[in-house]
A protein has these predicted regions:
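Metal-dependent de-N-acetylase/amidase catalytic core
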Residues: 2, 20-31, 109-284
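Short, solvent-exposed loop/turn elements at domain surfaces
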Residues: 40, 271-273, 319-322
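Bacterial N-terminal signal peptides
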Residues: 8-17
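Active-site rim/loop-helix segments in enzyme catalytic domains that contact anionic ligands
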Residues: 20-123, 153-157
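Solvent-exposed loop/turn segments at secondary-structure junctions
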Residues: 35-37, 63-66, 102-106, 134-136, ...
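Gly-Asp-aromatic-enriched flexible segments
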Residues: 78, 283-403
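Bacterial N-terminal signal peptides that target proteins for export
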Residues: 1-8
């Protein structure tokens, strides 16, 4: 089992508009059976990834040409592709690949395994989300899970990503505790909109299957209600998910979560260490948000003299709007204009800290620091700049209290 650090806090410093450019972009893939399933089962975490500036690709192994009660397969496949492209825009995906295999009869062939392995290799994926490869349930979904699992054996060790399972409507009913639960409250509406882009499914096919087609077609309000109730079963906080939320967010934070997505480490592929978890799932954990234009961020962490903390930060901010100059948490060097930065000699835009709300003694943090608290007090974070009003962007900061 993966164990979170005893005290782990992720702090996000951002401004509007958000640049969302991390120190090193992650390359994420979500592989599933039908256009719309990436949105349903991983639309929330995808929105969080792209919000943070990471690159995400969706890959559907069928064209969805059987998911309708009236449309002909070719016409439906074309329509569902267009719907996928609308969802691509909503989620800010870089790519949405739809393979031209028929819906309902997906087979685990050498050809498709090679295509999947090639896509993973070409994308240079760091992490791949896909279905749990079980038996029973929907043929295509389960087959997709097996295809990805077996395709992983075609990858060289240096190309091997981390694989993470997402549970579909069948495997979600199994008794298990997910390894990860992601709070998607802030992107719930984005996920809902991405699912809603697939009108052939959420306005026509699914209502038809439930015997409410006429009612749904008659009212936009009922359509919105149906979309919500069609999506919410895969985003609710069940008791088993609550345990995973508490593990990574803490009990108090977990109580406040309304919408969630659950995931599980695959037993194949590269395995994550504790450090990898927050690197590959950077949105997970307690999150504080504050404008990069603000003076100081109150972390809420009370330090005692002599305590040791480690701080890791990544991201990028625009510290000079007029000249379009960017920097990472180490700051921009050199900088000669102005002399009233809190930490002289450190780069403009660098991540800095202080202990105590009114403290005048500040220190450089940068990308990585181990700090011995020289006095007791609350930890604050800030941006090393004599004028923060022209800043944009974000830093993501993880703080661990060692002792």
């Amino acid at each position: 089992m993966l164990n979170p650090r005893i005290i782990t806090i992720i702090i996000v410093i951002l401004a509007t508009p958000v640049l969302g450019i991390s120190q090193e972009k992650l390359k994420v893939m979500v592989i599933f059976a039908h256009p719309d399933e990436g949105e349903i089962y991983a639309g929330g975490i995808t929105a969080l990834y792209t919000q943070l500036g990471h690159d995400v690709k969706f890959m559907s192994l069928t064209n969805g040409d059987a998911g309708h009660y009236a449309m002909k397969p070719k016409e439906l496949a074309e329509r569902r592709y267009k719907e996928a492209m609308r969802a691509k825009e909503i989620l800010s995906l870089l790519e949405y690949e739809v393979l031209d295999y028929h819906d309902g009869i997906l087979e685990n062939t050498e050809e498709i395994r090679k295509k999947v392995a090639s896509s993973i290799r070409d994308w240079e994926a760091d992490v791949v989300f896909t279905f749990y490869p079980a038996r029973g349930g929907h043929n295509d979904n389960m087959t997709a899970g097996w295809i990805v699992r077996e395709a992983s054996s075609l990858l060289d060790e240096e190309q091997m990503p981390v694989f993470i399972y997402m549970r579909d409507f069948h495997t979600a009913s199994f008794s298990y505790i997910p390894d990860f639960a992601i709070n998607i409250d802030e992107v719930w509406e984005t996920k809902l909109a991405a699912c809603g882009a697939h009108e052939s499914q959420v306005i026509e096919y699914n209502p038809k299957m439930e015997g409410v087609l006429d009612e749904v077609l008659a009212s936009k309000e009922i359509q919105a209600d149906f979309l919500f109730h069609n999506t919410i079963p895969f985003s609710i906080v069940r008791p088993d998910i609550r345990l995973a939320l508490e593990k990574w967010y803490g009990k108090e934070e977990a109580k406040e979560v309304t919408y969630v997505e659950e995931f599980e480490m695959a037993e194949y592929g590269r395995q994550m260490t504790d450090e990898d978890v927050f690197e590959l799932l950077p949105m997970m954990g307690k999150v504080h948000k504050v404008s990069a234009r603000a003076d100081w961020l109150d972390t809420g962490i009370e330090l005692s003299e002599g305590q040791i903390i480690t701080i890791e930060a990544n991201g990028q901010i625009l510290w000079n709007l007029k000249e379009r100059k960017y920097c990472n948490p180490d700051g921009a060097v050199p900088y000669t204009r102005g002399g009233n930065k809190p930490v002289l000699g450190a780069g403009t835009g660098a991540l800095i800290g202080r202990i105590g709300e009114d403290a005048t003694q500040c220190f450089l943090i940068g990308k990585n620091s181990k700090i011995h608290a020289f006095k007791s007090g609350r930890l604050y974070l800030g941006i090393n700049d004599d004028n923060t009003q022209d800043n944009e962007g974000l830093y993501r900061v993880r703080i661990q209290v060692i002792k």
